[in-house]
A protein has these predicted regions:
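Iron-sulfur cluster-binding electron-transfer modules in prokaryotic oxidoreductases
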Residues: 1-254
Length: 254
């Protein structure tokens, strides 16, 4: 089995996310899954860019899919925003032929075409659906039963359900099942499925700060040892925002 990897913009470039790429590569290698990075990968033009120029944003995402199509592989990504973009472009191009034609015209200008044959998968969904929690447990090497975590799915991997075709999006459990196979206690607590406010960062920082404060308080009150994020943007929001929030609210988050 061989997959084309689309890492996105955040994972390879932000210091606090270096572990995402390293861990993903190690896990896939351990599972004997070959990967090949998409050459000269570009930004996937996530959904907020689509409000500025829909056709161009779709063409940007389709470019990476066209590269994967040339490689003859389906695509994996650890980034929820990228996953959302690739699922959306596949849906739009298959549903609206006129939009497919416009996107193809842009791709032709850089010597590419996209026939819509590439399936885009989020790495967590791939591990759960194609590999399976039981198989991962067999390959585990450490006992993590002493750890309690708060799992954050984020918004962009799950919604809208009709487009992304992931488990029922309001109360998902698939990632919980994965980590619980290693003995980890995934604590079910109020607020763990709510937005972290990451998309508001840089636009309305005060609102993003307030929402993050609420999510950190939720996790603190649940008594978890740490937070595990499915979404790289959620990771940045939680990780980089903690020190600032400790100063603003005069509170130490565990």
């Amino acid at each position: 089995m061989k997959k084309a990897m689309a890492w996105g913009c955040l994972v390879p470039t932000r210091r606090s996310l270096i572990g995402y790429e390293a861990a993903t590569r190690k896990v896939l290698e351990h599972l004997n899954i070959e990967t090949a990075d998409i050459p000269n990968e570009t930004c996937c033009a996530p959904f907020w860019m689509q409000s500025l120029d829909l056709t161009t944003s779709l063409a940007m995402a389709a470019r990476n899919l066209a590269k994967a199509e040339e490689m003859g592989m389906d695509l994996l990504t650890p980034c929820s925003g990228c996953f959302h973009s690739y699922k959306r472009v596949n849906h739009v191009l298959k549903t609206y032929p006129d939009m497919h034609e416009k996107v193809d015209d842009i791709l032709k200008s850089v010597g590419l075409r996209y026939d819509g044959t590439v399936e885009a998968r989020h790495i967590v969904d791939f591990l759960y659906t194609d590999i399976g929690a039981a198989e991962l447990q067999k390959r585990s090497t450490r006992d993590l039963s002493s750890i309690s975590i708060g799992l954050r799915y984020g918004c962009h991997m799950l919604k809208p359900h009709e487009l992304l075709n992931i488990e029922y999006s309001e109360r998902p459990t698939f990632a919980d099942e994965l980590i619980e196979q290693f003995g980890v206690n995934s604590v079910q607590y109020p607020g763990r499925h709510r937005c972290c406010g990451g998309l508001l960062r840089g636009v309305q920082d005060d609102v993003a700060d307030r929402i993050l404060h609420e999510r950190l308080v939720d996790a603190n009150e649940a008594g978890v040892d740490g937070i595990v994020t499915v979404c790289s943007l959620c990771h940045l929001q939680h990780d980089m925002g903690q020190r600032r929030k400790s100063q603003c609210y005069n509170r130490c988050y565990r």
